[in-house]
Amino acid sequence: MSDSEEEIKQNTDPVDNAWSLKIPAFRQEDNPHGMVEESSFATLFPKYREKYLREVWPLVEQCVAEHQLKAELDLVEGSMVVKTTRKTWDPYIIIKSRDMIKLMARSVPFEQAKRVLQDDIGCDIIKIGNLVHKKEKFVKRRQRLIGPNGATLKSIELLTDCYVLVQGNTVSALGPYKGLQQVRDIVLETMNNVHPIYNIKALMIKRELMKDPKLANEDWSRFLPKFKNKNISKRKQPKSKKPKKEYTPFPPAQPESKIDKQLASGEYFLNQEQKQAKRNQERSAKQADAAKKQDERRNKDFVPPTEEAPSRKRQAEDSSKVDVKALKAKLVKANKKSKS
């Protein structure tokens, strides 16, 4: 059995942890004839990155030349281009180099961006601009992701082994593929108003649990922190709510018109003089009613208030109460007068 067959047999065995598998290296012997057609990718960069890119571009050309690629910098158009050559033997390196210039256009330094050319390193550009509608909320949640003095961002980098850069409406991440998955989950949940400290705590707990072989096949959910949403609706409730009418499949009855009301009361059949006489009668009745109410309002001040008559029970209580001391003093006084 040859070495290649043994490698294939080893790869087909069951794997407990898929993340532990190493990506097989692609060597030049695997593609000795090179590339038939030229492939190229271009990306634009902002004006403020022009000075930095001009300084590091010789290093970029030297880096891509190791993989038989060609890089061009167009300062007039503001674009970076990477191309394959006839000597390029790795078909996927052009995709990796495209990711590198994308990261450099998004303010990632060249020293970090060139790591994406490695086989076990990938990148992820997460768009967060359209996840929050209000600008104030977006800025607040983005700052929450960075943390005070960049502490939150640094802890995310240490736990995921990724380089993370928050720039404008995007978050650029660079590192191993498992770490990129964790970074994307943290960023998206942070923009959905879940504080990143919960996910950071969960990652720290998982890292400690992975060290214990006894807990390898157990559920870890009981160890992880549980987040409870405490958002309360801030909409002011009306003081008096109108009760909803019961639903009926039939449309409401048509309201009576003025002519219908006149027909019902018989006014429709009266002539002009009779209608005028009826209106005068109604007017005089209203005036008499208003005059009566006005007289009652004027005479209200002259009406004496009603006084409560003393009840018999209260009178009996007053008569039953006798002041003994006052009676004694009265008798002593009367005796003195009689002696004198």
Curated annotation (Swiss-Prot):
GO biological process: rRNA processing
Any one of the GO CC terms: nucleolus
Gene3D superfamilies, per the entry: K Homology domain, type 1 (3.30.1370.10)
Keyword RNA-binding annotated: yes
Biased segments, Basic residues type: 228-244
GO molecular-function term, one example from the UniProt record: RNA binding
Localization annotation: Nucleus, Nucleolus
Domain of life (superkingdom): Eukaryota
Residue ranges of the region described as Disordered: 228-259, 271-324
CDD domains the UniProt entry points to: KH-I_KRR1_rpt1, KH-I_KRR1_rpt2
Keyword Transcription among record annotations: no
Key words of the record: Coiled coil, Developmental protein, Nucleus, Ribonucleoprotein, Ribosome biogenesis, RNA-binding, rRNA processing
Coiled coil (residue ranges): 269-302
Segments of skewed composition (Basic and acidic residues): 275-301, 309-324
Domain KH: 124-192
Task of the protein: Required for 40S ribosome biogenesis. Involved in nucleolar processing of pre-18S ribosomal RNA and ribosome assembly. Binds to RNA. Required for female germline development, cell viability during eye development and for survival of dividing cells and epithelial cells during early wing disk development.
Family: Belongs to the KRR1 family.
Subunit structure: Monomer. Component of the ribosomal small subunit (SSU) processome.
Protein name: KRR1 small subunit processome component homolog
Organism: Drosophila persimilis
